[in-house]
Amino acid sequence: MEVDGEARPFLLFSKPKSSKKKPKQEAEPQVHTQPEEPPNPSPSPAIEPDLRDSDEAPAAAVTEHAGDDAAAAAVPSTFAELGLSQWLVDVCDSLGMRVPTAVQRRCIPRALEGRDVLGIAETGSGKTAAFALPILHRLGEDPYGVAALALAPTRELAAQLAEQFRALGAPLGLRCLAAIGGFDSLGQAKGLARRPHVVVATPGRIATLINDDPDLAKVFARTKFLVLDEADRVLDINFEEDLRVIFGSLPKKRQTFLFSATISDNLRSLLELSGNNSYFFEAYEGFKTVDTLKQLYIHVPPDAKELYLFYLLSKMNEDNIRSVIVFVSTCRTCQYLDFLLEELGHPAVSLHSHKPQSRRLAALHNFKSSKVPVLLATDVASRGLDIQTVDLVINYDVPRYPRDYIHRVGRTARATRGGLSISFITTQRDIRLLHEIEDVVGKQLGAYDGEMRDVNKDATKVFKARRLANMKMADEGHEDKVQARKEQKKRAQERKRKHDE
């Protein structure tokens, strides 16, 4: 993303700040009695003295990696040693967070110093707490107005972030607004006008709220923190115009936290732009999979993918598999398989962007709470979402890029538990993609060795369900939705082409 001279619409990082710190004073949360922020706050951000610019030389940029022995020796090992307020240490303990993870140990002290932070760590490594705890620490000292804006690439991830902020900030009486599509925008605009402590949003919805009512931009005039979770996806070209609106509403003097499971060229460029006073920590040691994950593939005839899927799912109890995520490449396939399994009487829920938001959240809740054993999903569920226990991942469609494969199969075999992934190989293209995946993960996938001689026993039932599912897709207008999305994507690509010219 370009930085165009003085305006710098995509300059995420603030000006270099002094590393000088005033003596730390422990502060109890000032919870429920904060005054209302004036209707027209001053455009200058209310920043603590230790974060203001000074005449002293700015702190140098710091880059560390998980394997840096010298740096690791000085890293705090408990939440109390990180410099957090005692009430936050107590909250972590009450939530079962006894020992900080690597990304938390490295990033939280730097954030408390006032640095901008870019943290790269795998899904499930505790990235949310790495940025939420420093924000809540500051809020405990000065709970006044919208202190933080956190952006996430998907509605589900934004909703999850809001839940985690509320859990961690409960003793503070935290007011957190989730501004996401699929819900009443008028109600969200009113909630934003009440100046909650933390706003968690998708870029599209928050930009729409500001465009519809430019006065809402004043709500962010004193925002101290900007967070981009799954930052490489938030910085995708599809969000560019929304981000211009959002960044134009934020003060230049702020801390910026970028966290992601994947380092991208955009993130590297932004790290260089940040210059001084930034901290980069990478706990991600390339694309790899855990040793407790058994990775298999199975050759499937092109016209029998549904048959093989139903056969594997019907063996869940026999194979002691309690939960399955089936990843597909398109929203159409996701909804189609939802209808198919419904016709076959196999309980499942689907998660994709064509689905109304309330139903998406309900589907995710039902799967996470084990009410439904099968989740059909596009890659919207491959990163960020906190789904603790998944026994089997099926790649119904092989992903185009090895990194997406890593994120998908990373939903299972978490926290030292074992797990299984099975990829359907149907075409020569799938074989090529399989070889690319093997090159990246550094190991060969094994051929599925389960019993498959009975796979055709339900062929008549499955083919009938396939016909009915396709009819339902047409009846409910899903084909029209697919076409509309294609046209929308085409227009976005055309805008990008003109912009590049």
From Swiss-Prot:
Keyword Nucleotide-binding included in the entry's annotation: yes
Which ranges are annotated Basic residues under compositional bias?
487-501
Q: Name one GO molecular function term.
A: RNA binding
Please list where the region (Disordered) is annotated.
1-68, 473-501
Q: Which Pfam families match?
A: DEAD, Helicase_C
Q: Which reaction does it catalyse?
A: ATP + H2O = ADP + phosphate + H(+)
- Name this protein carries in UniProt: DEAD-box ATP-dependent RNA helicase 36
Q: Give the classification, highest ranks.
A: Eukaryota, Viridiplantae, Streptophyta, Embryophyta, Tracheophyta
